[in-house]
Amino acid sequence: MLMVISPAKTLDYETPPVTQRFTQPQYLDHSQELIQQLRQLTPLQISELMKLSDKLAGLNAARYASWHPDFTPQNAKQALLAFKGDVYTGLDAESFSEDDFAFAQEHLRMLSGLYGVLRPLDLMQPYRLEMGTRLANARGKDLYAFWGERISQWLNEALAAQGDDVLLNLASNEYFGAVKRKALQARIIDTEFKDLKNGQYKIISFYAKKARGMMARYVVRERLRDPAGLKDFNAHGYYFSAEQSGPEQLVFLRDAPQD
């Protein structure tokens, strides 16, 4: 079973990594193509394109200028430890053992507007480029056109390498939109996490993001390979709803927040 999650806008390059192991991103030629295009934009253009403040636009213009594909632990950090935010709070990779990282490296992928697909231990230099950004490029009007079917092909390769055909989608719609479902040689399992609010179960973004991270953590810590085991997920009060679920859509409910 292979999992995919979204990246995060917030990055942490200050905290020392809890593992010294690292790998190199596999698709840097494509990343470099995007960087070369981003370098042509002024901070004002970046601000307008990405709807960023002047300060953040300037920061990312500097990031694009200093980005280079010679990644080392001195100028980059493992992706799973560099990303912060709700998903990564739930995932809590800082508490992983070396065996946890080894399992995650095989069974977890992060989708990225700049890097396409990242493995947990892939070194990553800081950036801001959300998948939904309408960055016109040689392949089309946006990043979905830029990546085309590549991401699906790379996920197929990862599935083939582990001899499996199950993809657990824990990514947002924005990011999983870059995956061509019909091109995937896999059974796709989607997930929903709902919390009780005003008498109804609803998807509450903050909680749902954190729950997706907790589900990824559950799979890693339990060394889960059979999707049937996903139904036993019960972190922080969530429980599987057979009534609301289907064969390829697993729904988890929670009656009260526990965090």
Curated annotation (Swiss-Prot):
Pfam families: H2O2_YaaD
Family indicated by similarity: Belongs to the UPF0246 family.
Official protein name in the record: UPF0246 protein PSPA7_1607
InterPro entries tied to this protein: YaaA
Biological process according to GO: response to hydroperoxide
GO CC field: cytosol
Highest taxon in the source lineage: Bacteria
